Amino acid sequence: MKTPKMNVESFNLDHTKVKAPYVRIADRKKGVNGDLIVKYDVRFKQPNKDHMDMPSLHSLEHLVAEIIRNHASYVIDWSPMGCQTGFYLTVLNHDNYTEILEILEKTMQDVLKATEVPASNEKQCGWAANHTLEGAQNLARAFLDKRAEWSEVGV
């Protein structure tokens, strides 16, 4: 039975056919003024087989959201997937996949050098007790270890 087309791009992705980790272009939108928004699916864990624990995911979200902007001014957002298998990276007016891979690599290398999770306090975070620098660094290290596979989505 054919699955009906959904409005959300990721709901149309056959999650049984992908091979994490990977980075893929999930969507492109052209604005009425000509701006281009590109959303990347940055998958760390194999869907329906593995997931990131919440404190590690939460800490990696904070670290990457802060650090990636040191490498790219066109980043709009870095947000976690509810399924806890990856993140979405959204950029403005930038459509160079190879450069995105490079800034992700640099960012993950910087995560490994971090000495604290940024904004992991009650004033700046809604769940400040839910962080682990070590867990975030383990996720970044595992992702970097598979750098050669990031372009192999499997679909």
Curated annotation (Swiss-Prot):
It holds the Pfam family LuxS. Its cofactor is Fe cation. Keywords: Autoinducer synthesis, Iron, Lyase, Metal-binding, Quorum sensing. The keyword Iron applies. Disulfide bonds: none annotated. Its EC number is 4.4.1.21. GO terms for biological process: quorum sensing. Fe cation binds at H58, H62, C125. Binds 1 Fe cation per subunit. GO terms for molecular function: iron ion binding; S-ribosylhomocysteine lyase activity. It catalyses: S-(5-deoxy-D-ribos-5-yl)-L-homocysteine = (S)-4,5-dihydroxypentane-2,3-dione + L-homocysteine. InterPro entries: LuxS_sf (IPR037005), Metalloenz_LuxS/M16 (IPR011249), S-ribosylhomocysteinase (IPR003815). It is an enzyme of class 4 (lyase). It comes from the Bacteria. The keyword Transmembrane helix does not apply. Belongs to the LuxS family. Involved in the synthesis of autoinducer 2 (AI-2) which is secreted by bacteria and is used to communicate both the cell density and the metabolic potential of the environment. The regulation of gene expression in response to changes in cell density is called quorum sensing. Catalyzes the transformation of S-ribosylhomocysteine (RHC) to homocysteine (HC) and 4,5-dihydroxy-2,3-pentadione (DPD). Homodimer. This is S-ribosylhomocysteine lyase.
